[in-house]
Amino acid sequence: MTEYKKPIITEMRPKITVIGVGGGGGNAINNMIAENLQGVDFIAANTDAQALATSKAERRIQLGAAITEGLGAGSVPDIGNAAAQESIDEIMDHLGGTHMCFVTAGMGGGTGTGAAPVIAEAARRAGILTVAVVTKPFSFEGQRRMQTAELGVERLRESADTVIVIPNQNLFRIADAKTTFADAFMIADRVLYSGVSCITDLIVKEGLMNLDFADVKTVMKGMGRAMMGTGEATGENRAMLAAEAAIANPLLDEVSMRGAKGVLVSISGGMDMTLFEVDEAATRIREEVYDEADIVVGAIFDRSLDGTFRVSVVATGLDSNRSAQPTAPEAMNGQTAAAVPSRTLQ
């Protein structure tokens, strides 16, 4: 009689890497590390050796050491591009085994604008699902820097699977007279944190409805323009309020999720989260997009959220010609809707 042997099951989770390119990208991953984001690897890549030395990332790449001698790209994207080309083999060594890569950078300068598209293109060609999350300059930084940023964004849209843009100028929509300059940038960085965490949480955390990496890939691969949103609420009607907050878009440039081809909905709450609430939130998001959109919904438990309901949305494949904004919902009396500051972005 053949002896039955219990099969050995090896747990395999997708490897997700966030690479911060240039000064802006480096600051973004420093904030994510400080927030203790779990389930991802971090890489800092910069032409500026001094800035790189202050990075909190364990893995650091000096871009274009021979070209820049560690002195930066001097706000010249061509130098940033050449620096990334020089270091591309080292970059891909660090990305070995990665299934999904977030490339974050500030557009308008030299390193981020020039190097980020090179890195995104190489990662995508290697079969890595590649998502770029970048910022555009404030208006006071000048027209030339803005034009440089726009060219960088267009190059990224040719290189990455999905591109999300945060216009820094739109931070004025959610700032007040007491908002510090540092706080404003942390608001923008929080968007990246929310986007990455909502994806990793759906895959690795205990939940009512978990997703696998293939679900994420379906919504994000080759989808181009995208947006993210996160909302939180407590009290009565918290599911609907959180969904409405996730849909709201104070950081957008005349873009709506209405024309999205793919939508990833991440719903999280404490052990008091009900199936009815999950249905209510998911239904509200579904009402915001066209019927033909590919919608993937996941719901997870987070014991730290007892009493709080959170909804995160990633909408991809947005048609820029469909720019009509949905009407913002009116506030409801006696209820608390506390959306995280960096709720939504283009």
From Swiss-Prot:
InterPro entries: Cell_div_FtsZ (IPR000158), Cell_div_FtsZ_CS (IPR020805), FtsZ/CetZ (IPR045061), FtsZ_C (IPR024757), Tub_FtsZ_C (IPR008280), Tubulin/FtsZ-like_C (IPR037103), Tubulin/FtsZ_2-layer-sand-dom (IPR018316), Tubulin/FtsZ_GTPase_sf (IPR036525). One of its GO terms (biological process) is division septum assembly. GTP binds at G23, G24, G25, G26, N27, G110, T111, G112, E141, R145, D189. It comes from the Bacteria. One of its GO terms (cellular component) is cytoplasm. SUPFAM superfamilies: Tubulin C-terminal domain-like, Tubulin nucleotide-binding domain-like. PROSITE patterns: FTSZ_1 (PS01134), FTSZ_2 (PS01135). Signal peptide: none annotated. Residues 320-346 are annotated as: Disordered. Pfam families: FtsZ_C, Tubulin. The keyword RNA-binding does not apply. GO terms for molecular function: GTP binding; GTPase activity. The keyword Cell membrane does not apply. Keywords: Cell cycle, Cell division, Cytoplasm, GTP-binding, Nucleotide-binding, Septation. It is found in: Cytoplasm. Belongs to the FtsZ family. Essential cell division protein that forms a contractile ring structure (Z ring) at the future cell division site. The regulation of the ring assembly controls the timing and the location of cell division. One of the functions of the FtsZ ring is to recruit other cell division proteins to the septum to produce a new cell wall between the dividing cells. Binds GTP and shows GTPase activity. Homodimer. Polymerizes to form a dynamic ring structure in a strictly GTP-dependent manner. Interacts directly with several other division proteins. This is Cell division protein FtsZ 2.
